[in-house]
Amino acid sequence: YSGWQTQPDTPTVQGTIERALTLVSRSPEPISIVGAGRTDAGVHARAMVAHVDLDLSPEEAEELRFRTDRYLPHDIALRSIVPVIEDAHARFSATARTYRYYLTTKKNPFAEEQMLRMHFDLDFERMNAAAAQLMAYSDFTSFSKLHTDVKTNNCRVTEAYWQSGAHDGEWVFTIT
């Protein structure tokens, strides 16, 4: 996929879900969804939140999720569709976002597309000291794209740390 957000003439996660929802629900109009954020091509989202404006009971929402999930390709899954308050917005109502970045110092062919492989030893004590410094800053303009509609690049980092992963040599960086 070329990331999350719908783009002309290229497969995206959002576009794939929208087509599936439209087809399965037999909607006369294309169904549009709004994601809480975006991912770039090659980035995996394990828990992307999105919203869609539909008037469904909880039972109808679960039936739509089940049927749509069966139609989606193997690499996209809908975990739930739940009714929320009318003015809820996946992007603008979010109060925090957590990102996790995975790396390994050992070869693992099963995780090759989900982890960055490092070919040298890392000092995680020093990396955690550096990560903690992120919480002292609020202006992240240096990490932002230029010439966008974003009004501010200020945010509050509440946690930033490295921890060992599920297997020897695997590490996870978490930032909220």
Identify what each model region corresponds to:
Residues Y1-T176:
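Structured-RNA-binding interfaces characteristic of tRNA pseudouridine synthases
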